[in-house]
Amino acid sequence: MYRRTTLWFLLLFQPILVFAQNRTELYECKIGTVNPLASTSLNACFKLYNTPKSFQAARRYCVSLGGQLADKINKDDSSLYSANADLEVANSTKFWVGASNLKCNIAWENGGEIEFNDMWAPESRYYGVAIDKMSIGGLWHTVPVGQKLPFVCTFQGKSNEAGPAPVHAMRAPAKKRVPKVEKPEEKDIDESLNAALSDKKEKKEVASDKKKESKKDEEDINESMNAALSDERKKSASLASSDKKESSKKDESSDEANLSASQVANAEMSASISASSANSSSDESSDEAYDSAEIEMRKKIGKTVIAMKSQEMASQSDDYDKYTEEDLLSAAASLIGGYILNAHWADSRTTNTSSFDSQTDEETLNMMMAIAEQIAMTMRSSKRRESSSSNTDSESASISESSQASEQAVMAAAMSAKSSKKSESSSKDESEDSASLNLEQKASAAASAALASKSKSDSSDQSKDQKSANVALAVVSENKHPTKKPEDPKSTKTTTEEPDIDESLNAALANQRSTTTKNSDLTTIITTVKPNALPIAIVAKQSEKDPACPAEWTQFNTNATAPALCFKRYEKPMNFEDARLFCVGKGGHLASIHNERQLLLLSALLHNNGPDALSDQTWIGLNRIHQKYYVYEDETAMDFTRWLPGAPNINDCTVFTGNELPNYPHKGTQYKFGDFPCEEVQKSVLCEVTLGKDKLKSQTTCQDGWSYYSHDGTAKNGKCYKRIDQSKKFSEAREVCKVENSYVASVQNEGEARFVSALVQTEKNYTVDEQTWIGYVKYDRDFGWEDGNKGLQFDPWTEKMPRQKKCTVFTGNEIHENCRSQFRFVSVDCNKTQRSVLCSKPPMKNGTPFVYKDTDNSSKKI
């Protein structure tokens, strides 16, 4: 019985005994005995604990002792803690303090931002703050909260005369004694108040009387002044009227004489003007016919010269490939508006050079451009008819030969007319000038006939075309040498190889962006003659938008109106000066970073999880080599920074970091600015191309309005992205992207997520039903992508957000002030309307855009 009672007693009261043995006694510290810097009740005293604990465990332990992890530490307290840690912390180099990002961004546990908040990367999750011992610098770090470290607790102080209740270290100041003043009786107050009011009333009455008297005096003065002024006006008016009558009588006779003289002069002048206008009208009529023929001739010659020069450059020049259609367009405009306009016009106007002025020059050029536009439309319609008709191979060959014959006939006629004009320009006779005019008209008519036969080649045979070409040559030869037979058209190719044509074309290509025309909508026909083939007519118009980024450059479009940004990272070790020259050689400059969007974009370019991730940093254009302040290489100001802790120091050049830097005393060094010696070699360089000034003429990767990114730098894994701001359900979002020959976007890795973050970022926070659709869908049992890609290479889901729905959105900013929901995936109902759609598609191949085709996933019903 005794044993049973003892057993029951032990079973019932053992938990109480264990609790009593393990109960932690509250730590009591007296004011000033431990912490000489104690100025507040929070940090009245502190104690370092050498037992390593995780961040949460250390926080709970301090609370159990009646204190907290060291909170709101200033620089002086930090130094004191670090110095004591050298004495009390044996087996570790750092200790926990009471700050972390468990709630959101790095902040003190009891609220308030940290003074050195730029030290930590905001995207790092589950990090606490730890401080080094003084012997190794006393620096601050962000450390994963699961790591076990010593820690420091702070407590409210207790008085030396402490009783059962704790007393704060700092007492409130005692109130000063105020001597008691006797209150006056109510009767005395009323009497004094009435007396004051009566005095005030009397003063007001006196002031109003004085004001009335002064106003009356002022009115009397004004009346007397007005009377005096009216008398003066009457006197002056009477004097003026008498003078006017006398002067009018004297001038009447002289006016009559002057009128008769002026009428005679006007009659003579009108007669002379009418005579001169009659003479000028006759001259202008002849000049108008002359100008029309000359314009037609110049157009033919310019077209032929460009065709020959294109053929010559294609066959002989090693640098021909670098010239694009825009180059030839600019060259054509320069040739028609420069060489031909000046040389041929001056040759034909030797007898009347006075009319060759800038106004005629511009009018003629505009007429030429209008004619070129009409011919371009004719050739396009002819080309459509030819493509729709089912001609045989023999007919195609016939068209090809007739086209070549027509072109050669035009060339021969033009050059014969030119040589004839040069031989006749030495004579100033009217008869020679009219003969030259007839010759040009005949040559122009022959050339027009040849071109007409070319445009109607689908209804005429080869013999007729050859005959018309021979007729054109015969007309020219008969005027020059009546007894000479026409030359073989094939031999006319080399007759126009003149140095002035070469110089003109080279000058036009060298200055390809400064055209001589003023017409912004210039359309020029450039015909390239190839053996045994139809002439290729290229109708090139000046682009109204900025050119797209060069091939394989990351292209970033923020919206439809802002210009695109073009960046590319080159894995080439070099110092800052070599990096600067390298980017200049690529047609751009070292990259500039001016806002959070660009920071996100470039962090995607530098994102690296490979073995060399710790040394992943690159040169950017920020430097102070030539001045005392920082400025970018493109001469833009430093208006946005994310410096590393302790930076900038004494170095003049800047790198942009990728992942954490090795051998750096702080954590949280991702995607920051760091000042480094300019002569130090960095592993890569980040270049930026300014649109419209790039020298790279490779084919673009994405169409206008799309942004390009490749997580590994290869076109194989590259994608073109575009955000479309239309409120749609998911099924409607599919159709929106399909119209753009794309799919609802796939975001498969951390690099793409960072890049897309910059695209979907907004100026304000939205709810979960106001986000951006992406193409991650739960089709049957598993998730997949609309474009057929499979899998995820990172964990994109938002914490404490649903994942069981079938469709997915990508968040821009925070949802309901949840900082962990920024730039993450959220599972949502497919039938809910979202704010925008993100589309993606493969990049262009050889300049050809991607064409939409259904995948196994995109064809499934949701």
From Swiss-Prot:
Highest taxon of the lineage: Eukaryota
Keyword check for Cell wall biogenesis/degradation: no
Compartments it resides in: Secreted
Leader sequence residues: 1-20
Glycosylated position list: 22, 91, 222, 258, 279, 352, 559, 765, 831, 857
Region annotation Disordered: where it falls in the sequence: 162-291, 377-437, 450-469, 474-504
Limits of the C-type lectin domain: 41-154, 562-687, 716-828
Compositionally biased region (Basic and acidic residues): 198-218, 242-252, 455-467, 478-491
GO CC aspect terms: extracellular region
Biased composition (Low complexity): 265-283, 388-418
Disulfide partners: 62-153, 653-678, 807-819
InterPro entries: C-type_lectin-like (IPR001304), C-type_lectin-like/link_sf (IPR016186), C-type_lectin/snaclec_domain (IPR050111), CTDL_fold (IPR016187)
Keywords: Disulfide bond, Glycoprotein, Lectin, Repeat, Secreted, Signal
Pfam families xrefs: Lectin_C
GO molecular-function term, one example from the UniProt record: signaling receptor activity
Identification of the protein by name: C-type lectin domain-containing protein 161
Source lineage: Eukaryota, Metazoa, Ecdysozoa, Nematoda, Chromadorea
